[in-house]
Amino acid sequence: MSSSYYVTPSQQRTLRACMVCSLVQLHSKFMRDGCPNCDNVLGLRGNNDAIQECTSQVFEGLITLRDPSTSWVARWQRLEGYVAGTYAVKVTGSLPDDVITNLEDSGVRYIPYVYLPGSCVSGDTDRLVGGMAVRWRRRPEVLELSSEVEVQFAWI
């Protein structure tokens, strides 16, 4: 295929998702071009260490957006304003504290998705996950994490 976005089956192991915007690309494409949505803050282009810290091989679901400005799926996933491409529905991983600080210093409003059993805050949504009632915290105002909490990141 002639598209630069085509990924052969043998290359699928090297797919990674940006932990800030959820864009999915090959490791080599992150290395060559960086992340088109947030490279100005993350500096992934040509930086293998940053790619390892700020992208993840653990993600679920794929969404391909041709025109994020008019797509209801882009609005639903909060991907409006991003470039056309393939995005993960859920990215699992944890950004280093210094990267989160850099995002905040750059004026990027970074809020991770967090699944927490038990207590809930205003605006939470009940979900049934694996037969267990879980609160889905979409927009936490104050986020306190412990080592027991699994965090899935998304840009809001």
UniProtKB/Swiss-Prot annotation:
A Pfam family annotated for this UniProt entry: Spt4
InterPro entries named among the record's database cross-references: RPABC4/Spt4, Spt4, Spt4/RpoE2_Znf, Spt4_sf
GO process terms (BP): mRNA processing; regulation of DNA-templated transcription; transcription elongation by RNA polymerase II; transcription elongation-coupled chromatin remodeling
Start and end residues, zinc fingers (C4-type): 18-38
Key words of the record: Centromere, Chromosome, Metal-binding, mRNA processing, Nucleus, Transcription, Zinc, Zinc-finger
Gene Ontology cellular component terms for the protein in this record: chromosome, centromeric region; DSIF complex
Gene3D superfamilies: 3.30.40.210
UniProt KW Isomerase keyword: no
Superkingdom of source: Eukaryota
Major location (coarse): nucleus
Protein localization: Nucleus; Chromosome, Centromere
One GO molecular-function entry: RNA polymerase II complex binding
Homology family: Belongs to the SPT4 family.
Assembly notes: Component of the spt4-spt5 complex. Interacts with RNA polymerase II.
Protein purpose: The spt4-spt5 complex mediates both activation and inhibition of transcription elongation, and plays a role in pre-mRNA processing. This complex seems to be important for the stability of the RNA polymerase II elongation machinery on the chromatin template but not for the inherent ability of this machinery to translocate down the gene.
Protein name stated in the entry: Transcription elongation factor spt4
